[in-house]
Amino acid sequence: MAAIKSEVSAMKRYKCRVCGYIYDPEKGEPRTDTPPGTPFEDLPETWRCPSCGAKKKMFKPLD
């Protein structure tokens, strides 16, 4: 269990360049039915920012 938590913590967060929303893989995103532990890279290309609707390509990595 500790190994899984450290893997999730190592995943990068991404910020929407349109509205500033931050996707945190450790938390996931309930509004889009994205479970905790889902890396940004694994989100489908059709995934949109839950705050403003921007496309996935409008996000930039943090950290």
Swiss-Prot record:
It comes from the Archaea. Fe cation binds at C16, C19, C49, C52. The keyword Electron transport applies. Keywords: Electron transport, Iron, Metal-binding, Transport. GO terms for biological process: alkane catabolic process. Binds 1 Fe(3+) ion per subunit. Its cofactor is Fe(3+). Gene3D superfamilies: 2.20.28.10. InterPro entries: Rubredoxin, Rubredoxin-like_dom, Rubredoxin_dom, Rubredoxin_ET, Rubredoxin_Fe_BS. GO terms for molecular function: electron transfer activity; iron ion binding. It holds the Pfam family Rubredoxin. Residues 11-62 form the Rubredoxin-like domain. Belongs to the rubredoxin family. Rubredoxin is a small nonheme, iron protein lacking acid-labile sulfide. Its single Fe, chelated to 4 Cys, functions as an electron acceptor and may also stabilize the conformation of the molecule. This is Probable rubredoxin.
